[in-house]
Structure formats: C-alpha cells, structure tokens
C-alpha cells in the first residue's frame, strides 16, 4: 500500500489550568489513519520522555513525524484524535 501524508489533530489542555484548551497537530506519512495516530503518539511520547530525562529532543523522522512543539504540562486526549489527509497550503 502506498504511503499517504496525514494530519492528526489531538485535543489538549493545560494540567495546571484545564480551562486552557487547544489542539496539537501532527503530520507525517503512514499507510492509513490508524497507523498515523500510532506514529504521532509514538513520536509524542519519545519527545516527552527525552524532555523529562534532560536529553536532546528527537528530530523529525524521515517519514515526517515529529513532536518538538509538544508542551510539557499539557495533556493530550488520544482517544479523541481525528485524522484527515493532509492538504498542503502553499499560502502559509
């Protein structure tokens, strides 16, 4: 199966101030939406673990997944994650 580029949107909120809410967007290539969520979560967890250990944050993987912008102290609701094919907007 050919890989496609996906956008995974994950609801997030501040653990210290739950009224502060948002979404964290991950993008990268995967075979399907289920794999996209799995890969996004894996890079997110690796980034949080590196940050907690005081190690350098992982760089973006060759397939596009990265999570350097994940905020410490913010919770992510992976059960509410949504996946859509990523559409590049060249105006951004």
State what each model feature region is:
Residues 1-23:
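Short aromatic-glycine-(Arg/Gly/Cys) micro-motifs in beta-strand/loop hairpins
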Residues 6-8, 23, 35, 41, ...:
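Residue-level marker of intrinsically disordered, low-complexity segments enriched
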Residues 9, 31-32, 63, 77:
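Acidic-enriched, low-complexity/disordered segments with a strong bias for Aspartate over Glutamate
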Residues 10, 18, 27, 76-84:
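A structural signal for the main folded, soluble domain(s) of proteins
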Residues 20-33:
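A short, exposed loop/beta-hairpin motif centered on an aromatic-Gly-Thr core
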Residues 31-54:
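A short, charged, amphipathic alpha-helix used as a generic interaction element across diverse proteins
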Residues 46-92:
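Short, mixed-charge low-complexity intrinsically disordered segments
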């Amino acid at each position: 199966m050919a890989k496609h580029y996906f956008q995974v949107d994950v609801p997030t909120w501040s653990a210290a101030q739950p009224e502060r809410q948002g979404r964290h967007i991950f993008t990268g290539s995967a075979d399907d939406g289920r794999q996209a969520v799995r890969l996004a979560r894996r890079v997110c967890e690796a980034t949080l673990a590196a940050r907690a250990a005081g190690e350098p944050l992982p760089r973006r993987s060759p397939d596009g997944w990265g999570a350097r912008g994940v905020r410490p102290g913010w919770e992510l609701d992976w059960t509410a994650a949504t996946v859509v094919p990523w559409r590049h907007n060249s105006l951004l």
